[in-house]
A protein has these predicted regions:
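Acidic, metal-associated active-site segment
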Residues: 42, 95-111
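Alpha-helix capping/helix-boundary segments
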Residues: 7-8, 38, 73, 101, ...
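Acidic catalytic patch
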Residues: 65-85
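Active-site regions of enzymes building and remodeling cell-envelope glycoconjugates
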Residues: 64-65, 124-130
């Protein structure tokens, strides 16, 4: 399972459905991966918080394997975004991080766990929500 930023933020914020989904994945023994661009987004957000928030993010991220952006994944991300933009006449509105997350999902043939369903569906990858 590829964990998107939206899921991890909801999990950190104590959102019940996110917690229950995380518990389900743990109970099932599912591998939960965090793409490195998600780490970037979380670190950016935490930088605006206090030391407790920064520590909480660092500690939480230690629980998951981080998938680095390789050349292959980066190229796939570009193709996924280009296809989504072409399908939407150049106006998909998808940011640059979501295709990088989607490319990791494509590489591992795993769904993205997110609250941001529409963008990931437009990128053509499997999606789960909570």
């Amino acid at each position: 399972m590829i964990l998107d930023t939206s899921f991890l933020i909801d999990l950190f914020d104590g959102q019940r459905h996110a917690f229950e989904k995380g518990q389900q994945l743990s109970d099932e023994g599912a591998v939960q991966r965090v793409p490195s661009p998600v780490v970037t987004e979380l670190s950016y957000g935490a930088a605006f918080g206090d030391e407790d928030e920064r520590r909480a993010v660092r500690n939480a991220l230690r629980m998951y394997p981080v998938v680095e952006q390789t050349d292959r994944i980066a190229q796939r991300a570009g193709r996924l975004l280009a296809r989504a933009d072409m399908d939407a006449d150049g106006r998909s509105g998808i940011d640059k991080v979501d295709p990088m997350v989607a490319a990791v999902a494509d590489r591992y043939d795993e769904p993205v766990l997110t609250a941001n369903v529409a963008d990931f569906e437009a990128l053509g990858v499997a999606v789960e929500t909570y």
